[in-house]
Amino acid sequence: VPGATIALIARPEFKSVQELRGKTVGINAFGGALESAARLMVKHFGIDPDKEIKLLATGPMESRFAAMKQGLTAATLGSPPTDFLGKKFGFVVLARAHELFSFPVSGLIASVKKIKERPDEIKRVIKAGIKSNRYFIQNREGTIQIMTEWMKIDREMATATYESVLKAFSDDLSLPENGLRLLIEEAKRAAKVEREVAMNEVADLSILREAQRELGIAQR
């Protein structure tokens, strides 16, 4: 998934991301995907994440919503079905990360040793991932049914979740270079790493390209 399926959810009096300037935004914990998404999303709208908003770790989704109800925070972030549940509480979705920029927070990870010793196994997993993503994109009803059974949620929530994340999925598992670079820079910031980190230090897309060719997918 080349884009983060994370939504910025606010109390109803806030009509735009810009209105969060000077406010407190709740996240689950520091050092994770929600903190990164919060920083990148407000920055996209011209807000300095270091000076013009305050991030507050308020725990799991239920606690984050409680903090908003109590007026301790103006907004929070979360992946579906957080946006669906937030709307049920009367909150509003101001922005979705995958609609603003590429920021891959999920993918296939393997050690260098594994890549060298078992490339065919990795390629099979990648092909399965491509096929599953294509099923997800092309088969709405089948996917929603699977979600109700696997996630143990009702159809309304499954449908809302599907619609929220659909555009974030890639039909060939391609990873945009700008998204990977953004991910690296954010990881460097969190880990306080100052040296340059080349993309080939953290990503090997050669097996993905091979899998795409074997499936007849044109290179982008």
Where are these regions (language model features)?
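Conserved C-terminal helix/tail region of periplasmic/extracytoplasmic solute-binding proteins
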Residues: K188-R220
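Short capping/connector residues at structural and topological boundaries
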Residues: E19, V25, E99, D120, ...
